[in-house]
Amino acid sequence: MTTLTAQQIACVYAWLAQLFSRELDDEQLTQIASAQMAEWFSLLKSEPPLAAAVNELENCIATLTVRDDARLELAADFCGLFLMTDKQAALPYASAYKQDEQEIKRLLVEAGMETSGNFNEPADHLAIYLELLSHLHFSLGEGTVPARRIDSLRQKTLTALWQWLPEFVVRCRQYDSFGFYAALSQLLLVLVESDHQNR
């Protein structure tokens, strides 16, 4: 990626981690439709690989603002997609896609991190991968740890995530009838792909 700084990419990962970790509350719902978010989306669209995915997400958000009981409907979408059985869902866990659930634990140890006791989900949850990527991008921007070491860990994390993220996105698109989480997952997919290619 050329125009976004390491800190900006870190913020995108942290934002996506938050949205995939729990249902949106009223404040978050107001925030994603705000003028401030529109500016942020405009910045993201300056990155050509992200433009189409951001446009799709903005269209979903515009539709969301006129949806009756938007928060409750989104909560139902979140629950149906991420908390139910895997028959008609997109479970946000590496282990749901036959991946090694211990890999993220090894990566966290290597980064000197651990999961928070406040997050009551298994360590192989998508949000943990995204928080780790956010942390690594912030670290790149700070310059306190050798960039080569951080970049190596970033590439390992991206590779581990890429093993199952495309299938997760397909399932989001298949089972999210409204499309908000499908659009969000598509943005994540192109972000990870661009980040992975930016060695």
Swiss-Prot record:
It is found in: Cytoplasm. The keyword Protein biosynthesis does not apply. This is Chaperone protein TorD. The lineage of its organism: Bacteria, Pseudomonadati, Pseudomonadota, Gammaproteobacteria, Enterobacterales. Involved in the biogenesis of TorA. Acts on TorA before the insertion of the molybdenum cofactor and, as a result, probably favors a conformation of the apoenzyme that is competent for acquiring the cofactor. The gene is torD. GO terms for biological process: protein complex oligomerization; protein folding. It comes from Escherichia coli O139:H28 (strain E24377A / ETEC). GO terms for cellular component: cytoplasm. It comes from the Bacteria. Its main location: cytoplasm.
